[in-house]
């Protein structure tokens, strides 16, 4: 122990790195989800305002060319939420712990 500082053994350091990496990925996913929910909320608000305007002003049609672009983003977000998501890749930790996997570049030991 140089300078009296304790050193971590390699397996413990690797485990700490994996835990930190998984926590970082989880935080990134949470931020992306919150970002999507924020956009969905804004889009739904735009959709309801457009519908209210169309219903309160009979001279403007909801399907007019000026109103249609306002409806597309919320409808797209609703479709993304309703359609099934593509299959997910296995987690990084499970790929690192399976010894009989082929060489995966930087993940290989």
Swiss-Prot record:
Predominant location: host cell
Keywords: Host cytoplasm, Host-virus interaction, Phosphoprotein
Disordered as annotated region, ranges: 89-109
Keyword Phosphoprotein attached: yes
Keyword Zinc (UniProt): no
Gene Ontology CC terms, in alphabetical order: host cell cytoplasm
Protein name: Avian agnoprotein 2b
Subcellular location: Host cytoplasm
């Amino acid at each position: 122990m140089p300078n009296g500082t304790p050193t971590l053994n390699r397996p413990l350091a690797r485990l700490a790195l994996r835990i930190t990496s998984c926590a970082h990925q989880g935080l990134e996913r949470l931020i992306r989800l919150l970002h999507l929910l924020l956009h969905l909320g804004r889009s739904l608000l735009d959709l309801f305002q457009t519908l209210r305007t169309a219903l309160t002003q009979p001279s403007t049609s909801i399907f007019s060319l000026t109103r249609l672009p306002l409806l597309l983003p919320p409808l797209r977000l609703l479709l993304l939420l309703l359609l099934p998501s593509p299959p997910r890749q296995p987690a990084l930790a499970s790929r690192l712990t399976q010894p009989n996997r082929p060489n995966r570049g930087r993940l290989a030991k």
